C-alpha cells in the first residue's frame, strides 16, 4: 500500500479534485434535501441532564469551553513553537519545520479541538439558559446536535490517528515524539474523547445517522484549507497523504471519507448504548476511550531518548 503515498509519472490532482467536488455537491444536496439542519430537539435534551443537576452540567460544559479557548490561545502564544515533519509542496520531500504563532492552528487536531470548543460554548450557553429559567433559542436547538456530531466524529479520528499512526510512525523514523506529550497536545488528542464521552453519557443530545454529513463536510473544508495553505500560504502539507498529486490521491481521500464515517458510526453506537442503559454506556465509553488514548511515555517508543 506504500505506493499510494508515492508520486507517479503523472500527478493525480485533477482526479482527486473531481472526487472532492462530487463529494461536496452530494453532501450539500443531501443536507438541503433531507432537512437534517431543521430538525430540532427539545430544550431538555439540549441543555439538561437526567443524571446530574442541570447546574452541574452547565458548569462542566463551561469549563470545557474555557479550556478549549485557553488551549488554542496557549499554543498560538507559545514561543518555543512545535517541530513538525511535513511534506514541502515544491520539493515534495519531508523536512522538519518549526511552526510558530498562528501557523500552530493549521493541524487537523487543532481544527477538531476548535469544533470541540464551539460545541461546548453553545451547549454551555444553552444549559445556563435552562438553569436561569430562560428559553434556548431555536437556532441553538438545531445547531448543538450538529456541532456535537462533528466534534465526536472528528475527536475519535484525531485520537486514533495520533495514537496508532503519527506517534509510532514518527518514532520509527527517529523523530522526537515528545511534543505529542505536552499538556496541550495530550488535551487535544486524549482529553478530547474523555470530555466528550462524559458529555455523551451525562447530557441528552441525540445524534442521528444522517448527521454523518457534518463530520464529512468538516473534513472536506479542512482538506480545502490544507491545499490552499500548501499552495498559497505555508508551502507545506502537514499530512503527506493529503497531497492530491499523489499516485493514490483519489483512493486515499475516498478511504478518508470511509474512516470518518466509521468513527462517526462508533460515536453513534456509543450514544445508542448510553440511551439504552446508562451503566452500559459508561462502561462502553470508558473502554472505548481507554483503548485509543496514549498512555505510554515517549521513552517507551523505539528510537526515543530515555
Regions found by a protein language model. Give the residues of each.
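Early transmembrane hairpin module of multi-pass membrane proteins
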Residues: 2-4, 11-130, 143-145
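Membrane-interface transmembrane-helix boundary segments in multi-pass integral membrane proteins
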Residues: 2-21, 106, 233-295
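Transmembrane-helix exit/juxtamembrane "anchor" motif
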Residues: 27-41, 76-80, 125-128, 266-280, ...
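Interhelical loop segments of eukaryotic multi-pass membrane proteins
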Residues: 36-48, 78-96, 130-139, 170-178, ...
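Membrane-embedded alpha-helical transmembrane segments of multi-pass integral membrane proteins
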Residues: 67-70, 74, 116-126, 151-165, ...
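Interfacial segments of alpha-helical transmembrane regions
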Residues: 134-156, 207-217
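Membrane-interface loop-to-helix entry segments
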Residues: 181-193, 250-255
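Alpha-helical transmembrane segments in multipass membrane proteins, preferentially the mid-helix core
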Residues: 191-207, 229, 263-271
Amino acid at each position: 500500500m506504500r505506493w499510494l503515498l508515492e508520486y507517479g509519472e503523472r500527478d493525480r490532482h485533477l482526479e482527486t479534485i473531481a472526487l472532492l467536488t462530487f463529494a461536496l455537491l452530494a453532501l450539500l444536496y443531501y443536507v438541503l434535501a433531507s432537512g437534517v439542519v431543521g430538525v430540532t430537539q427539545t430544550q431538555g435534551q439540549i441543555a439538561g441532564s437526567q443524571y446530574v443537576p442541570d447546574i452541574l452540567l452547565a458548569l462542566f460544559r463551561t469549563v470545557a469551553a474555557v479550556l478549549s479557548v485557553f488551549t488554542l490561545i496557549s499554543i498560538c502564544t507559545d514561543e518555543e513553537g512545535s517541530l513538525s515533519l511535513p511534506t514541502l509542496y515544491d520539493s515534495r520531500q519531508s523536512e522538519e519545520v518549526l511552526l510558530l504563532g498562528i501557523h500552530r492552528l493549521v493541524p487537523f487536531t487543532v481544527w477538531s479541538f476548535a469544533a470541540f470548543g464551539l460545541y461546548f460554548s453553545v451547549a454551555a450557553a444553552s444549559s445556563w439558559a435552562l438553569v436561569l429559567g430562560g428559553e434556548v433559542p431555536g437556532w441553538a436547538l438545531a445547531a448543538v446536535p450538529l456541532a456535537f456530531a462533528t466534534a465526536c466524529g472528528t475527536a475519535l479520528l484525531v485520537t486514533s490517528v495520533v495514537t496508532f499512526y503519527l506517534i509510532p510512525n514518527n518514532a520509527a523514523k527517529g523523530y522526537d515524539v515528545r511534543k505529542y506529550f505536552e499538556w496541550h497536545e495530550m488535551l487535544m488528542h486524549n482529553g478530547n474523547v474523555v470530555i466528550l464521552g462524559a458529555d455523551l453519557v451525562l447530557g441528552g443530545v441525540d445524534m442521528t445517522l444522517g448527521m454523518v454529513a457534518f463530520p464529512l463536510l468538516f473534513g472536506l473544508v479542512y482538506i480545502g484549507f490544507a491545499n490552499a495553505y500548501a499552495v498559497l500560504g505555508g508551502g507545506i502539507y502537514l499530512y503527506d497523504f493529503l497531497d492530491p498529486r499523489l499516485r493514490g490521491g483519489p483512493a486515499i481521500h475516498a478511504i478518508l471519507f470511509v474512516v470518518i464515517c466509521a468513527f462517526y458510526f462508533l460515536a453513534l453506537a456509543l450514544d445508542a448504548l448510553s440511551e439504552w442503559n446508562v451503566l452500559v454506556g459508561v462502561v462502553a465509553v470508558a473502554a472505548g476511550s481507554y483503548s485509543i488514548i496514549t498512555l505510554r511515555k515517549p521513552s517507551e517508543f523505539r528510537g526515543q531518548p530515555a
